[in-house]
């Protein structure tokens, strides 16, 4: 467990929701868990779902056989709701049928406890499940942070490359940025996904990167180009393609550079 996950786990008292139509079982679970956890109880599946509209426990202990909604019906409802789906669920039952245990795990429960349970084992399995859940959340947070850092770095590199082209061709200064900006706005209005918009933005920024391979005196020439010079200019699409084709994570970059002067008509 990472330090940040451990610190978080120890800085708050996690909440456990116990769902069982037996008051004896909910009382027993509350006594065992009460020292280390905030314990909420519900005597039916319906009450459980109603309670979850305002509460978000770290773990749900769910009885399988209850009047009205049984445990499987409750679990299905939990997993179909984006707000409750991430909450880990441990099934509790006096049924020692292996098929019940297999079904519960297949349908999304993280563990299965047979009643009557041994207090020490019961407490340890609850603790392990909550710690694992907190660790997974912490890891996901770290992944998201690193992903955002990578995206930021990637965009900075792309801006630097497009800036290099602009520095060489002062007649079209800011051209690549404007192309990227207008392209992503068109994509947004067409209903493209956020990821597709980001990809199109990158293609716009780097579509002219091949001009790096064109001689500066040709790019900056303010008189008519010779046939040879014009041919040299046209080759910037191929140069750009060769520069960007190694970026296999986003093949659209190379495609955009290679064909951005082609016309559909």
Q: Model-found features: residue ranges?
A:
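Metal-dependent catalytic cores of enzymes that make or break cyclic nucleotides
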Residues: 162-265
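Active-site beta3 strand of CheY-like receiver
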Residues: 55-61
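Two-component/phosphorelay signaling modules centered on CheY-like receiver
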Residues: 22-41
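Receiver (REC) domain active-site loop signature in two-component systems and cognate sites
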Residues: 66, 104
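C-terminal output helix
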Residues: 116-126, 130
